[in-house]
Amino acid sequence: MPLHESGEDYLEAILVLHEQKGNVRSIDVAQHLGYSKPSVSRAMSILRSSGYITMERDGRILLTEAGKTAAESVYERHRFLTK
């Protein structure tokens, strides 16, 4: 399923937060992006059903291989554009 820009933003945030903190939860993504918790929960549901993330019972968000590949691609593109 193709990603929209907002989905890319969420995946990139998860990647960055995972590198900074290790464990990532929805509240971390909400704070990082400045979005409401309900908005993030909806986005996580879409990303999960699209196969980009999994969510553990304790609330941790993990990128799947497809999610990690997409997140790294977005991150590199943003780094290139900001240089």
Residues covered by each model-derived region:
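N-terminal helix-turn-helix DNA-binding core of bacterial DNA-binding proteins
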Residues: 2-35
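Key DNA-contact positions within bacterial/archaeal DNA-binding proteins
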Residues: 38
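Short, hydrophobic-biased segments on the C-terminal half of alpha helices
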Residues: 44-45
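A short, conserved structural fragment
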Residues: 48-58
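Basic, amphipathic "hinge/linker" alpha-helix immediately C-terminal to the N-terminal HTH DNA-binding motif
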Residues: 59-77
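Amphipathic alpha-helical dimerization/coiled-coil segments
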Residues: 79-83
